[in-house]
Amino acid sequence: DDCGKLFSGCDTNADCCEGYVCRLWCKLDW
């Protein structure tokens, strides 16, 4: 659930990606 991890790989933290502003970072990571 740590959004911080999603910076290195949002694929492993899809839940966080869909959960909060981290979603934006997830898309940027693509």
UniProtKB/Swiss-Prot annotation:
Q: Give the GO molecular function terms.
A: calcium channel regulator activity; ion channel inhibitor activity; potassium channel regulator activity; toxin activity
Tell me which GO cellular component terms the UniProt record holds.
extracellular region
- Record localization: Secreted
| Cysteines paired by S-S bonds | C3-C17, C10-C22, C16-C26
Keywords noted in UniProt: Amidation, Calcium channel impairing toxin, Disulfide bond, Ion channel impairing toxin, Knottin, Neurotoxin, Potassium channel impairing toxin, Secreted, Toxin, Voltage-gated potassium channel impairing toxin
Tryptophan amide sites (modified residues): W30
Where, by tissue, is this protein expressed?
Expressed by the venom gland.
Name any one Pfam family assigned in the record.
Toxin_12
- What SUPFAM superfamilies does this protein map onto? omega toxin-like
According to the UniProt entry, the note on domains is: The presence of a 'disulfide through disulfide knot' structurally defines this protein as a knottin.
The record's similarity note reads: Belongs to the neurotoxin 10 (Hwtx-1) family. 19 (HpTX2) subfamily.
Q: What else is known?
A: Negative results: has no affinity for Kv1.4/KCNA4, Kv2.1/KCNB1, and Kv3.4/KCNC4.
Q: Its biological function?
A: Inhibitor of voltage-gated potassium channels of the Kv4/KCND family. Inhibition of Kv4.3/KCND3 and Kv4.2/KCND2 is strongly voltage-dependent, while inhibition of Kv4.1/KCND1 shows less voltage-dependence. Its binding site may be near the potassium channel voltage sensor. Also blocks calcium channels.
What's this protein's name?
Answer: Kappa-sparatoxin-Hv1b
Organism annotation? Heteropoda venatoria
